[in-house]
C-alpha cells in the first residue's frame, strides 16, 4: 500500500511500528509516519 510518496511496504500489522515508521522518518513527514502505520496494519489484514 503506497503512502506519503515515500515508497511501498507490504507486511504484517506488527511491522508497522518499526518498518513503516522508519520509512516515514526518512521522509521526515508526520503524515507519512501515520500513513505507514495504517498501511502496515491494513496490509497485515489483507495478508
Curated annotation (Swiss-Prot):
GO terms for biological process: defense response to bacterium; killing of cells of another organism. Thermostable. Retains 100% activity after incubation at 60 degrees Celsius for 60 minutes and 15% after incubation at 121 degrees Celsius for 15 minutes. Its main location: secreted. Transmembrane segments: none annotated. It is found in: Secreted. Keywords: Antibiotic, Antimicrobial, Bacteriocin, Secreted. GO terms for cellular component: extracellular region. Stable between pH 4.0 and pH 8.0. Has bactericidal activity against various Gram-negative Campylobacter, and the Gram-positive L.monocytogenes and B.subtilis. In vitro, inhibits C.jejuni strain ATCC 33560 (MIC=27.3 ug/ml). Antimicrobial activity is lost upon treatment with proteinase K, pronase, pepsin, trypsin, chymotrypsin and papain, but not when treated with catalase, lysozyme or lipase. Belongs to the bacteriocin class IIA/YGNGV family. This is Bacteriocin curvaticin DN317. It comes from Latilactobacillus curvatus (Lactobacillus curvatus).
Amino acid at each position: 500500500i503506497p503512502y506519503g510518496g515515500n515508497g511501498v511496504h507490504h507486511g504484517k500489522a506488527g511491522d508497522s511500528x518499526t518498518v513503516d515508521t522508519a520509512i516515514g522518518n526518512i521522509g521526515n513527514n508526520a503524515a507519512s509516519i501515520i500513513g505507514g502505520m495504517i498501511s502496515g496494519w491494513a496490509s497485515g489484514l489483507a495478508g
